[in-house]
């Protein structure tokens, strides 16, 4: 099975190199770009499965680079994935600093870099029309992850994302997936909805 994955990585990498070379000399169509983005996502999925494998110690880095290459082609889903990855690591580093055992200036600096990069990717995904990115950025603003905490601005982004998606009937599921199961969040969102109506 591992031999098959190695073969698949080589095959996809070869196709991506050919598409990149073609992009340098020609203006590719939308279908070609979509196909290249799909190859990046397929490669990222393979590397995600190979995390912590002794023959691929840098699989996680390769997965991130696959998403980064797809994001360079203006893919909203890739930007959203990168935003989630960087936000998760930044929150973990912030938690380490708050616990006090592993607090260092280098850790705080790296956490801030990750927060900045996460917000940049979430904003890029939001500009490309990704509803989940707008929602996650709203959650970041509500909780003060990498930015100054502002509940009003955060709730506005969450309400805008729900409006954009037209999913007012799915609010309980959306809140559960975001970790906003508290009644005060639900009442604040409903007040915002009444305010926009």
Map each language-model feature to its residues.
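N-terminal alpha-helical interaction modules that lie
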Residues: 1-40, 192-196
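Short helix-capping/linker turns of helical repeat alpha-solenoids
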Residues: 26-29, 35-36, 48-50, 55, ...
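Hydrophobic face of amphipathic alpha-helices that form TPR/SEL1-like repeat modules
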Residues: 42-50, 81-89, 93, 100, ...
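Small-residue (primarily alanine) positions within well-ordered alpha-helices
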Residues: 44, 70-71, 78, 118, ...
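TPR/TPR-like (Sel1-like) alpha-helical repeat modules
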Residues: 149-166
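Terminal, low-structured helical/coil segments at or just beyond the last alpha-helical repeat
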Residues: 165-197
């Amino acid at each position: 099975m591992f031999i098959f994955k190695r073969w698949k990585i080589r095959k996809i990498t070869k196709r991506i190199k050919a598409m990149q070379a073609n992009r340098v000399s020609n203006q590719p169509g939308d279908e070609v770009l979509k196909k290249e983005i799909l190859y990046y996502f397929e490669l990222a999925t393979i590397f995600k499965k190979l995390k912590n494998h002794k023959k691929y110690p840098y699989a996680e880095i390769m997965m991130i680079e696959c998403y980064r290459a797809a994001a360079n082609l203006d893919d909203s889903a890739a930007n959203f994935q990168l935003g989630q990855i960087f936000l998760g690591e930044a929150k973990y580093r912030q938690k380490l600093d708050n616990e006090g055992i592993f607090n260092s200036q280098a850790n705080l600096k790296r956490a801030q870099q990750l927060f900045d990069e996460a917000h940049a990717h979430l904003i890029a995904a939001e500009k490309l029309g990704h509803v989940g990115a707008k929602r996650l950025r709203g959650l970041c603003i509500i909780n003060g992850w990498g930015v100054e905490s502002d509940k009003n601005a955060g709730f506005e982004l969450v309400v805008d994302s729900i409006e954009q998606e037209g999913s007012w009937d799915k609010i309980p599921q959306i809140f559960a997936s975001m970790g906003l199961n508290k009644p005060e969040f639900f009442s604040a969102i409903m007040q915002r909805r009444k305010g926009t109506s």
